[in-house]
Amino acid sequence: MSFHLDYLLALPGVRVETCTQVEEKIFLGLSILSKGIVCHHCKNPTGKLHQARPILVRDLSVFGRPVYLKIPRRQFYCPTCQRYPTERIDFLDVKRRHTQRYEQNIYERVKQSNMEQIVREEGLNYDKIKGIFEQVKKNRIGNGLNEFVSMR
């Protein structure tokens, strides 16, 4: 697509291939720049793509419009250990459907106001907002403990 969209999106390791608007929502089709991964199981590199299924991930809004990223979820075959590791994406936590920066934004906004207001603003249900808030809070506590241990 355009260097400008890649620059504005500012997510590592991806390129914007398509940009479409449906009603009030913006959809960005992304491609991943890396050709392979390091297997999570045996730590050997592999570039043998087994399958790629797209997932839809919510990102920060732009100009008051919600943004969704269509990301290929790639699974590779590792000939060394004969397993099928799924590629990890830097800006997306495992089994999450929102970018880390979107979840961080929700967390900060809930701290400043309340969940009901964020539910109205984002168009998500209460349980989803609460789940995002609790997940970010849990990650922060875990990171805080790790920092504390490393200081000792």
Identify the role of each PLM range:
Residues 1-83, 89:
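Short, conserved DNA-binding cores of transcription-related domains
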Residues 43, 58-152:
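Short, positively charged, Gly/Tyr-enriched micro-motifs
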